[in-house]
């Protein structure tokens, strides 16, 4: 009852429905927010504020993490600000304050349901699918620290790795075991997460999924960003895709289709399907929708990833430098690109590839 009333903003109903004998920290947090929203000017203001403060103290006694209490208090502030701006007729600012309040509420819920686990946001996409420009736009959001193209199993980088002594040890001594790689990776992520927590920013990891699915003789069974992190961190993740033919033509333009064998459209279709199978159940969004409506797309993406959104990203993303700029000639323009010319042999494959046709149907793209 109090949850439904809370979502509707019926603060008095939340207060009336609150059981004072409750041991549910969420109930006490909702009660505290409702008390703050119903404070009226007058001689009893101090008493009302004290009652709300005691509700938050009780929530903590019932097991709510300090971070969850702080997030809910910030939500209360944003709700009050949104109401004041709305009354003043400043609709745009009121909407932004309301969105921030919703974001703080999301964060509270996650902190309560996954106590003791730091939150990490992850993005998964294949090469040449528009992931870099989308990632730049995410990195341009307030309070976001994005680490681009991460995969501890990748062994196709530069021979010069002065900042990675364990990889140098592997090259000069012996292959590392999966457990040794995992231990090193977790220690690095723990340090990154600690830095982000101390700086008050959200850590976003852009997975280099190309390593897992489009390199070598077969897709990997192990996907380390998810498989290594899921036990220790609370992951909130999304998948982005592009028309597979455009992605494949992008691979050909870079010469990357030779990184998997056989280097055919049929094989690419099989590997793309394996990628989708692995991340089935995650929210999936299209690059084409991003290009035709970047603000709407990014607002929705931030909601899915539980990140704070700001429309100011449009003026900032062009100055952000990330690895993976494989095909985009402009740093600040968001627009659909014309399809690259289709080689004759690819056209023949396109008409006769069962896996690729299955992929198009699954993603609801036309050939």
Per-segment meaning from a language model:
Residues 32, 37-44, 67, 89:
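Short coil/turn linking the two alpha-helices of tandem helical-hairpin repeats
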Residues 1, 30, 37, 73-76, ...:
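"A position-specific structural signal for the A-helix of alpha-solenoid helical repeats
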Residues 16-24, 60-74:
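Flexible helix-coil transition and linker loops at the boundaries of alpha-helical arrays
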Residues 202, 207-312:
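PAPS-dependent sulfotransferase catalytic domain
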Residues 3-15, 45-58:
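Helix-turn-helix repeat elements of alpha-solenoid scaffolds
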Residues 93-192, 208, 314-366:
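PAPS-dependent sulfotransferase catalytic core
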Residues 5, 35-37, 42, 78, ...:
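Residue at a conserved register position within TPR or TPR-like alpha-solenoid repeats
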